[in-house]
Regions:
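Sec-dependent N-terminal signal peptides of Gram-positive bacterial secreted proteins and lipoproteins
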Residues: 2-25
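A surface/extracellular/periplasmic glyco- and lipid-processing/surface-interacting theme
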Residues: 27-71, 75, 80-347
Length: 347
């Protein structure tokens, strides 16, 4: 009987050892690594962190910018004088120098709201302030908090209005102190794919190695495809768009571009944007562009982007620039030289 008990204990021990070692088999390790590799990199989908939407100055005298490569989503939109401004969205990764920061304009509020973001600006037009108050937007204003949640970089050889910056730690401190919620249940604006999307096989695909997006005589934005790294190198008005801190040229994984009507409403040339409605545009990634549609039904409603077959677009894993152009400005999407005659678009 004792002999049988010993055999029974021995068998059970072997089975337990085998079971404990199951997860350490080479095949299982590979599967775990593959599973981890499929995790979305541009944002952490497992968290419900609320974004910050920061107004960025794009007057040429304010170049270079700081911190924009860590923005997962950027909008570029026309303002008065043919100058553009950016709205840079930060979520999981917020750098310690962002800027330079500029004042608010009314239609930028729409894009902060569609992302359920805390709005960050340094001053604003009277119309923008009126809307911020009436819409009860959570916002952090450099006019109120210079020296506390915003700072001046006086080492820069720039006009004073181009020297305003903030940093991630300051924004988080401000949000807590001002009692803003720091999580969001609204979800991301855009849908992303952990698997690489090949746009070349889609209907209407254009080769897209070089992209020219005209805003005015003052401002043109260009992208050039880097096939080795599968990103677009960003330039503006003939100059590489570089970072003040790193010196590196900014890149984009995804580009969405479309056109809306704009008009001046005051003697300063401040703009109104006819951005509630629908229209057509392009989604560009990995060297190709495909035609899409866009629709925004209210100021706080999310803009919905769809392929021509009616399916919502999915983006490659990486940062995105949304280029909202004035109507009737040049949009040129060009392929490599041998295909350039067939693969260009001008609107």
């Amino acid at each position: 009987m004792k002999y049988l008990k010993k055999i029974f204990v021995l068998v059970i021990s072997v089975l337990l050892i085998a079971g404990c070692g199951k997860d350490k088999l080479p095949g299982n390790d590979k599967r775990e690594k593959d599973k981890e590799a499929k995790k979305l990199q541009i944002v952490d989908e497992s968290k419900d962190t609320r974004s910050y939407a920061v107004m960025i100055n794009n007057n040429h005298q304010a170049w270079p910018h700081a911190g924009l490569q860590e923005s997962y989503l950027n909008y570029e939109i026309i303002t008065e004088g043919g100058i553009t401004r950016f709205l840079a969205l930060f979520r999981d990764s917020i750098p310690e120098k962002i800027g330079s920061i500029r004042s608010s304009r009314i239609y930028f509020l729409d894009y902060a709201m569609e992302n359920d973001a805390i709005y960050v600006h340094w001053g604003g037009s009277k119309e923008a302030y009126s809307d911020i108050n009436s819409l009860k937007l959570d916002h952090i204003d450099g006019m109120d908090y210079e020296g506390k949640y915003f700072f001046r970089d006086k080492t820069l050889n720039r006009a004073y209005e181009h020297t305003g910056f903030t940093k991630g730690s300051m924004l988080k401190e401000a949000a807590t102190a001002l009692g803003f919620k720091t999580t969001s249940d609204k979800g991301l604006l855009l849908n992303y794919s952990v698997d690489e999307i090949d746009l070349s096989k889609m209907d209407g695909a254009l080769k897209a190695d070089d992209i020219e997006i005209e805003y005015s005589n003052y401002q043109t934005t260009n992208y050039k495809y880097d096939s080795e790294n599968k990103v677009y190198l960003r330039s503006m008005s003939g100059e590489a768009h570089t970072d003040l801190v790193t010196g590196k040229q900014y890149t984009a994984k995804n580009i969405i571009t479309y056109q809306v009507k704009n008009s001046s409403y005051d003697s300063y040339g401040r703009q109104e944007l006819d951005n509630i409605g629908s229209g057509e545009g392009y989604y560009i990634s990995n060297g190709y562009a495909v035609p899409i549609t866009w629709e925004k039904t209210c100021r706080s409603c999310k803009t919905v982007y769809k392929y021509k077959d009616g399916q919502e677009i999915k983006l490659n894993d990486g940062n995105t620039w949304i280029q909202i152009q004035p109507l009737n400005k040049v949009l040129d999407i060009t392929g490599n030289k041998e295909n350039s005659n067939n693969n260009s678009s001008e609107e």
